Amino acid sequence: MVVFLGRHLPALLEVFKKGSAKAESDNRQGAGPSQGPGSVGDELQDNVFFPSGRPPHLEELHTQAQEGLRSLQHQERQKLSKGGWDHGDTQSIQSSQTGPDEDTISIYSQKSYMTESSTAEDALSVRSEMIQRRGSTFRPHDSFPKSGKSGRRRRERRSTVLGLPQHVQKELGLRNNREAPGTPQPPGSRDAVRIPTVDGRPGLALGTGVRVSLQALEAETEAGTDAEAVIQRHIDRVYHDDTLVGRSTGARPPPLTRPMSLAVPGLTGGAGSPEPLSPAMSISPQATYLSKLIPHAVLPPTVDVVALGRSSLRTLSRCSLLSASPASVRSLGRFSSASSPRPRSRNASSSSDNWSHSQSSETIVSDGSTLSSKGGSEGQPEGSVASNNVAPPPPGGSGRGSPSGGSTAETSDTASIRSSGQLSGRSVSLRKMKRPPPPPRRTYSLHQRGSAVPDGPLGLPPKPERKQQPQLPRPPTAGGSSGVGAVSCPPSSAGTWGSGLSPGGSRRPPRSPERTLSPSSGYSSQSGTPTLPPKGLAVAPASPGKAQPPKPDRVTSLRSPGASVSSSLTSLCSSSSDPTPLDRSGPQMSTPLSDRFVIPPHPKVPAPFSPPPSKSKSSNQAAPVLAAPAVAPGQVSTIDTSPASPSMPQTTLTPAQESPVASKDESPPPSPPPSYHPPPPPTKKPEVLEEAPPPPEAAVEILPDPSWPPPPPPAPEEQDLSMADFPPPEEVFFNAGPELGPLESCSSEAAVPPAASLSQTPPPAPPPSSGSEPLARLPQKDSVGKHSGAPREDSGTPLVTPSLLQMVRLRSVGASTGIPNPSPGSSAPQKPLRRALSGRASPVTAPSSGLHAAVRLKASSLAASESPASALPTGIPEAEPRSPQSPASKASFIFSKGTKKLQLERPVSPEAQADLQRNLVAELRSISEHRPPPQAQKKPSKAPPPVARKPSVGVPPPSPSLPRTESLTAPSTNGLPHAEDRTNGELAENGGVQLAATEKMGSPGSDPQKKLV
């Protein structure tokens, strides 16, 4: 029946077509007259499955489908009735086992079967061909093509089986029954597809073959030969003639001449060793890629061959990379680091290995990227230095800037590593990623590294340091360099850094300047754009003890924590911990330990008189945090100024950090804050005036700023103060201290050293400063206490905060304008912090930073000169000292832009500043309560750097003090009304705090600040 239909299909189809056409024509004729145009719609509506209503194309489809079904059924019946296929399968299977001719046999059997099948299914095949020729959309499964396909498939399968690797056959006991074991046949000798053994020799009983067999190597190694030497010899032997690698077809080259594949190094060449010797599995890095033999491939120097023995695991060969590309070094480092403890002989390995010491090979990967971005030499020095000591990295100083890829890049890596803890170095891409994250991460890494000043940048030094002393260095970086980041966490870290950091700090400063640019990584630039200035600024801050200031350059972005290096960092730190801002303004996070140690090295001449112990006291709180010794003095006066302002902005941060401060300062500060807090908004301006005296102090200090070198002596004071050695002033300090403490707790690590510098610088001013500062401090402490004790109250100071915030921003924009104004005092302290924190933010330090630095220096100098004359200037001098720390100062400006600040900054006339400062002093004395305004100012400080704001918790603390300092200075310079003066005073008092406050409360002063900008 099927055959009949198949043979007569064409006629049948024609009949169907004719019938359907007739039916359709009749249908149309019948419906046409009545339905007219609607006939087409009716046709479409017809039941397609009703035979009479089907259009011809549908009919054809149905016919084809039926044919396909019939052909399938026919096939099934044939299979059941005939043994042809089964017979063929059996034959082919048998042949596959029979021998070399199996393929031919199977082909024959299939061919014979196909002929039968084709004759039997001739009709079907013809019919299916016909249908296909017609190009129908439906092609029935025609049995012939199907059978052919299946046959082909089986053949292919058989061929694959024929190719079973000989070692597999041996293991399965399928050893060639068909061929004598000793007589290998050339691959082309038979039709069957044979997969030649990888090494190109016949699969004899040698135990060689596809299996990666390092028997020869093992034998030699066991014999006592140096594994490395053996491997090298073997590789040389294998690759002496790479041209033959590809010749697997045709006459096979003599086994000895044909080089072995990398994956299967012809280590089996000496194959005689008994099977047990061969490793259960041996893995080589290239094995993955060696599925095919690559004609001219050479074993890369970085490849390690590891043999997993049945009983042991050992690295058979480790290539030494004497000269390898960064990538290869990277991979090599990875393998070497992971595989073997002993360092690679390659040169690059020095840096890679250093990394690898503390980190896994992954670090090496990062290192590889570092090498490429860093340039091997720089990355290496950094790595080596880091390895040797965090301190040594000075060579990386420039490298740091550029090492953003390497050291700096590593810093990114480091930052990321630091962030992840001691993660292995991340790759360059990560580094890139890191920079944007830096603000937050910076805060994090800074906090982490608060103690590790050396890593001025977030993780820059740390990475090497991490290698060397991953954990200690890192905290130090946070504390000393990244005071900001460290601020919150770093107290302990910072302490550690003190010892470990000092080297890092010193090394950091050198790089900091350059780094500043690189560090900005966007953030640093943001903070002051003093990327470049940071260097100069860093120099001035460094003198006070700001090894960090130099760091700022790189740190600026990474290290912004330290010197408000990056406004974002400031933001982060400040949001992270209010105390940080204080520290920043006073200590200029960067300076903490770094400053301490590095200040002497490259002290910026402008080291005003270190603030009196009062600063120290402020610093006391900070000192406990991390770099109390260095930071305390500066921080006390600067922070005092800064804290008050910052305390409010930092309320969020301060509370947590303030607790520490409070514990240090005790509840006194908290209580005072409430009393003062109520007046914050109104008092803010009065407070500014009130605090103006502290700003003069700052100014005095700042004036000496040029002689930052003097700060070293103050540092002791600062330490004492930090140590809370000044119980008498403690009350005042406690008031301001709580804020200071909180700020310093976060920022103390990073900022305390800067503060110390400031305090050291302003020693002359201390007396007046002490007198006024205590008052200012009280307000500050109130502010701080409010922050810590009554942060909410400080929050109440939002008025100041918004303006201060805006002011801070304006300041950052108009750092130059702000610098002169800040010089009166409030600005100066903040500026120093900022400068220290961000090398680029050293606008206050005219020498180091660009216009901002120059303006700020001018302002600070003016303020300093006035300050020395009167206590009022003292506050400014303090600010000014920060100015010298222009990195921080600039950051301070940026962050502590306060409306008041702006206004003050605008009137840069020294006289106006002096008057304002005097007013501020008077107000501070009379209105020490009005610390809340300082807090508000502190918030404005935070606000300036948008990025900083993001991390407002973490960044503002470090930056706020600087911003405050700047704010204070700016107000004095601007000669704004008492409101501005107050802002300045607050800034001076609150220093770091003011940053946060200014940022937060910058709204009032935002306009002025903007104008400045």
Swiss-Prot record:
The UniProt regions of compositional bias labelled Low complexity, in chain numbering, are 336-361, 484-493, 515-530, 564-577, 615-633, 859-873
Q: Where is the composition biased (Basic and acidic residues)?
A: 73-89, 168-178, 779-795
Residue ranges annotated as compositionally biased, kind Polar residues, are 90-99, 106-120, 362-375, 408-427, 635-657, 814-829, 964-975
Locate the Phosphoserine modifications and list their residues. Answer: 92, 136, 143, 159, 213, 320, 325, 328, 336-337, 339-340, 398, 402, 407, 543, 610, 667, 671, 838, 842, 848, 909, 952, 959
Modification Asymmetric dimethylarginine occurs at: 318
- Annotated region (Disordered) at 20-195, 330-1013
* Location of Phosphothreonine modifications: 160, 529, 591
Keywords, sorted A to Z: Methylation, Phosphoprotein
Record's keyword annotation contains Phosphoprotein: yes
Positions of modified residues (Phosphotyrosine):
108
What the entry lists under InterPro entries is as follows: NHS-like (IPR024845)
What spans are recorded as compositionally biased (Pro residues)? 600-614, 668-683, 706-716, 942-961
Q: Give the top-rank taxon of the lineage listed in the UniProt record for this protein.
A: Eukaryota
The protein's matches in Pfam families, at most eight in alphabetical order, are given as: NHS (PF15273)
Q: What does this protein do?
A: Able to directly activate the TNF-NFkappaB signaling pathway.
What is the designated name of this protein?
Answer: NHS-like protein 3
